[in-house]
Protein backbone atom coordinates (compact mmCIF):
# COMPACT_ATOMS: atom_id res chain seq x y z
CA UNK A 1 0.00 0.00 0.00
CA UNK A 2 1.08 3.57 -0.72
CA UNK A 3 0.36 6.93 0.89
CA UNK A 4 1.25 9.74 -1.52
CA UNK A 5 1.41 13.38 -0.47
CA UNK A 6 2.79 16.64 -1.73
CA UNK A 7 3.69 19.28 0.80
CA UNK A 8 2.97 22.06 0.46
CA UNK A 9 0.02 21.24 -1.75
CA UNK A 10 -0.50 22.71 -5.20
CA UNK A 11 -2.02 25.29 -5.35
CA UNK A 12 -3.49 25.77 -1.87
CA UNK A 13 -0.12 25.72 -0.08
CA UNK A 14 -1.19 23.39 2.74
CA UNK A 15 1.72 21.84 4.65
CA UNK A 16 1.66 18.32 6.08
CA UNK A 17 3.59 17.01 9.06
CA UNK A 18 5.64 14.42 7.18
CA UNK A 19 6.76 12.60 10.32
CA UNK A 20 3.18 12.13 11.54
CA UNK A 21 2.00 10.97 8.11
CA UNK A 22 4.94 8.56 7.87
CA UNK A 23 4.18 7.07 11.29
CA UNK A 24 0.51 6.63 10.40
CA UNK A 25 1.36 5.05 7.04
CA UNK A 26 3.93 2.68 8.50
CA UNK A 27 1.52 1.63 11.26
CA UNK A 28 -0.78 0.35 8.51
CA UNK A 29 2.03 -1.30 6.58
CA UNK A 30 2.09 1.34 3.85
CA UNK A 31 5.01 3.19 2.32
CA UNK A 32 5.04 6.99 2.16
CA UNK A 33 5.91 8.83 -1.04
CA UNK A 34 6.44 12.60 -0.77
CA UNK A 35 6.46 15.00 -3.70
CA UNK A 36 9.04 17.57 -2.63
CA UNK A 37 8.95 19.68 -5.80
CA UNK A 38 7.75 22.94 -4.22
CA UNK A 39 10.36 23.10 -1.46
CA UNK A 40 13.31 21.26 -3.00
CA UNK A 41 15.99 19.79 -0.70
CA UNK A 42 16.91 23.33 0.34
CA UNK A 43 13.80 23.74 2.48
CA UNK A 44 12.65 20.17 3.13
CA UNK A 45 14.20 16.70 3.37
CA UNK A 46 11.42 14.11 3.74
CA UNK A 47 13.52 10.92 4.08
CA UNK A 48 14.98 11.79 7.54
CA UNK A 49 11.37 12.51 8.56
CA UNK A 50 10.25 9.00 7.62
CA UNK A 51 9.37 9.12 3.93
CA UNK A 52 10.25 5.96 2.00
CA UNK A 53 10.44 7.59 -1.42
CA UNK A 54 10.82 11.24 -2.45
CA UNK A 55 9.98 12.49 -5.93
CA UNK A 56 10.75 15.78 -7.63
CA UNK A 57 9.67 17.28 -10.89
CA UNK A 58 13.25 18.22 -11.71
CA UNK A 59 11.85 20.36 -14.51
CA UNK A 60 11.00 22.86 -11.78
CA UNK A 61 13.37 24.12 -9.08
CA UNK A 62 16.13 21.53 -9.40
CA UNK A 63 16.93 22.46 -13.01
CA UNK A 64 15.49 25.92 -12.50
CA UNK A 65 15.65 27.50 -15.95
CA UNK A 66 12.52 26.23 -17.74
CA UNK A 67 14.65 24.33 -20.25
CA UNK A 68 14.73 20.73 -18.97
CA UNK A 69 12.07 18.00 -18.74
CA UNK A 70 13.09 15.57 -16.00
CA UNK A 71 12.04 13.74 -12.86
CA UNK A 72 13.89 12.40 -9.84
CA UNK A 73 13.08 9.47 -7.53
CA UNK A 74 15.01 9.13 -4.26
CA UNK A 75 15.08 6.40 -1.62
CA UNK A 76 17.45 5.19 1.09
CA UNK A 77 16.00 1.66 1.13
CA UNK A 78 18.09 -0.90 -0.79
CA UNK A 79 15.17 -3.19 -1.65
CA UNK A 80 13.11 -0.30 -2.98
CA UNK A 81 16.11 1.01 -4.90
CA UNK A 82 16.72 -2.38 -6.54
CA UNK A 83 13.09 -2.55 -7.70
CA UNK A 84 13.18 0.99 -9.03
CA UNK A 85 16.48 0.41 -10.80
CA UNK A 86 15.18 -2.80 -12.39
CA UNK A 87 12.19 -0.89 -13.73
CA UNK A 88 14.48 1.87 -14.98
CA UNK A 89 16.77 -0.61 -16.69
CA UNK A 90 13.96 -2.55 -18.39
CA UNK A 91 11.79 0.36 -19.52
CA UNK A 92 14.48 2.89 -20.39
CA UNK A 93 13.18 6.25 -19.07
CA UNK A 94 16.63 7.83 -18.95
CA UNK A 95 17.65 11.42 -19.56
CA UNK A 96 19.76 12.35 -22.53
CA UNK A 97 23.36 13.37 -21.74
CA UNK A 98 22.57 17.01 -22.49
CA UNK A 99 19.47 17.09 -20.27
CA UNK A 100 21.52 15.46 -17.52
CA UNK A 101 24.19 18.12 -17.92
CA UNK A 102 21.58 20.91 -17.79
CA UNK A 103 20.07 19.46 -14.62
CA UNK A 104 23.47 19.13 -12.95
CA UNK A 105 24.26 22.71 -13.92
CA UNK A 106 21.01 23.91 -12.38
CA UNK A 107 21.76 22.16 -9.10
CA UNK A 108 24.86 24.31 -8.67
CA UNK A 109 22.73 27.42 -8.16
CA UNK A 110 19.75 25.78 -6.43
CA UNK A 111 20.41 27.27 -2.99
CA UNK A 112 20.96 30.76 -4.38
CA UNK A 113 17.83 30.59 -6.52
CA UNK A 114 15.64 29.25 -3.72
CA UNK A 115 16.83 31.94 -1.33
CA UNK A 116 16.26 34.73 -3.85
CA UNK A 117 12.82 33.49 -4.88
CA UNK A 118 11.88 33.29 -1.20
CA UNK A 119 13.14 36.80 -0.57
CA UNK A 120 11.14 38.09 -3.53
CA UNK A 121 8.04 36.10 -2.58
CA UNK A 122 7.95 37.49 0.94
CA UNK A 123 8.01 41.05 -0.35
CA UNK A 124 5.31 40.27 -2.91
CA UNK A 125 3.11 38.65 -0.26
CA UNK A 126 3.41 41.77 1.90
CA UNK A 127 2.40 43.83 -1.13
CA UNK A 128 -0.55 41.62 -2.12
CA UNK A 129 -1.96 41.54 1.41
CA UNK A 130 -2.45 45.31 1.28
CA UNK A 131 -4.27 45.41 -2.07
CA UNK A 132 -8.05 45.94 -2.02
CA UNK A 133 -8.34 43.74 -5.12
CA UNK A 134 -6.92 40.74 -3.23
CA UNK A 135 -9.01 39.01 -0.57
CA UNK A 136 -6.66 36.21 0.53
CA UNK A 137 -3.00 35.29 0.13
CA UNK A 138 -1.80 31.71 0.60
CA UNK A 139 1.90 31.41 1.41
CA UNK A 140 3.87 29.20 3.79
CA UNK A 141 6.63 31.69 4.50
CA UNK A 142 9.32 30.02 2.39
CA UNK A 143 9.81 29.11 -1.23
CA UNK A 144 8.69 30.96 -4.32
CA UNK A 145 5.12 29.66 -4.64
CA UNK A 146 2.21 31.95 -3.78
CA UNK A 147 -1.51 31.59 -4.39
CA UNK A 148 -4.04 34.36 -3.93
CA UNK A 149 -7.75 34.98 -4.37
CA UNK A 150 -9.04 38.10 -6.06
CA UNK A 151 -12.18 39.98 -5.07
CA UNK A 152 -13.62 40.06 -8.60
CA UNK A 153 -12.96 36.84 -10.51
CA UNK A 154 -14.41 38.34 -13.71
CA UNK A 155 -11.28 40.52 -13.92
CA UNK A 156 -8.87 37.57 -14.02
CA UNK A 157 -8.47 37.62 -17.84
CA UNK A 158 -7.68 41.34 -17.70
CA UNK A 159 -5.22 40.81 -14.83
CA UNK A 160 -3.35 38.12 -16.74
CA UNK A 161 -3.32 40.07 -20.00
CA UNK A 162 -2.06 43.22 -18.26
CA UNK A 163 1.12 41.59 -16.98
CA UNK A 164 4.30 42.45 -18.87
CA UNK A 165 7.07 40.74 -16.90
CA UNK A 166 5.25 37.82 -15.31
CA UNK A 167 4.36 35.19 -17.92
CA UNK A 168 1.05 33.30 -18.09
CA UNK A 169 2.12 29.63 -18.06
CA UNK A 170 1.52 26.36 -16.20
CA UNK A 171 5.05 25.56 -15.10
CA UNK A 172 6.91 26.79 -12.03
CA UNK A 173 10.26 26.89 -10.29
CA UNK A 174 12.30 28.70 -12.93
CA UNK A 175 14.25 31.92 -12.78
CA UNK A 176 11.39 33.70 -14.58
CA UNK A 177 8.17 34.52 -12.71
CA UNK A 178 4.99 32.83 -13.94
CA UNK A 179 1.27 33.17 -13.20
CA UNK A 180 -1.20 30.30 -13.51
CA UNK A 181 -4.99 30.12 -13.42
CA UNK A 182 -5.74 26.65 -11.97
CA UNK A 183 -9.36 26.68 -13.13
CA UNK A 184 -8.37 26.63 -16.81
CA UNK A 185 -4.85 25.20 -16.61
CA UNK A 186 -3.48 22.84 -13.97
CA UNK A 187 -6.87 21.68 -12.66
CA UNK A 188 -9.03 22.09 -15.75
CA UNK A 189 -9.71 18.34 -16.02
CA UNK A 190 -11.10 18.03 -12.49
CA UNK A 191 -14.94 18.18 -12.35
CA UNK A 192 -15.95 21.59 -11.08
CA UNK A 193 -17.89 20.31 -8.07
CA UNK A 194 -14.86 18.28 -6.95
CA UNK A 195 -12.46 21.15 -7.56
CA UNK A 196 -14.62 23.61 -5.62
CA UNK A 197 -15.05 21.16 -2.73
CA UNK A 198 -11.29 21.25 -2.19
CA UNK A 199 -11.17 25.05 -2.15
CA UNK A 200 -9.86 25.47 -5.70
CA UNK A 201 -12.26 28.30 -6.39
CA UNK A 202 -12.59 30.30 -9.59
CA UNK A 203 -11.04 33.38 -7.98
CA UNK A 204 -7.69 31.66 -7.33
CA UNK A 205 -4.43 32.53 -9.07
CA UNK A 206 -1.00 30.98 -8.52
CA UNK A 207 2.37 32.71 -8.77
CA UNK A 208 5.78 31.13 -9.19
CA UNK A 209 8.18 33.87 -8.20
CA UNK A 210 11.54 33.99 -9.92
CA UNK A 211 14.73 35.89 -9.28
CA UNK A 212 14.00 39.12 -11.14
CA UNK A 213 14.23 42.51 -9.44
CA UNK A 214 11.39 42.41 -6.93
CA UNK A 215 10.39 46.03 -7.54
CA UNK A 216 9.82 45.21 -11.20
CA UNK A 217 7.59 42.29 -10.21
CA UNK A 218 5.63 44.38 -7.71
CA UNK A 219 5.12 47.15 -10.26
CA UNK A 220 3.91 44.57 -12.78
CA UNK A 221 1.40 43.11 -10.34
CA UNK A 222 0.29 46.55 -9.16
CA UNK A 223 -0.41 47.64 -12.73
CA UNK A 224 -2.36 44.46 -13.48
CA UNK A 225 -4.37 44.29 -10.26
CA UNK A 226 -5.22 47.99 -10.12
CA UNK A 227 -6.03 48.35 -13.82
Q: What do the predicted segments below correspond to?
A:
Residues 113, 181-227:
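PLP-dependent enzyme catalytic core of the Aspartate aminotransferase-like
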Residues 103-112, 144-151, 206-210:
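Short, well-ordered beta-strand elements within core beta-sheets of diverse protein domains
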Amino acid sequence: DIVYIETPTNPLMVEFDIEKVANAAHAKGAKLIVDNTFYSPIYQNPIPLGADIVVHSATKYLAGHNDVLAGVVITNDKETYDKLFYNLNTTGPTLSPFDSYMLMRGLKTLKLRMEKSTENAREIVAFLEKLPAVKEVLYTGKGGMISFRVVDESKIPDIINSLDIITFAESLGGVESLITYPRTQTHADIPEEVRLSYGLTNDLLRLSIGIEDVEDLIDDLKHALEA
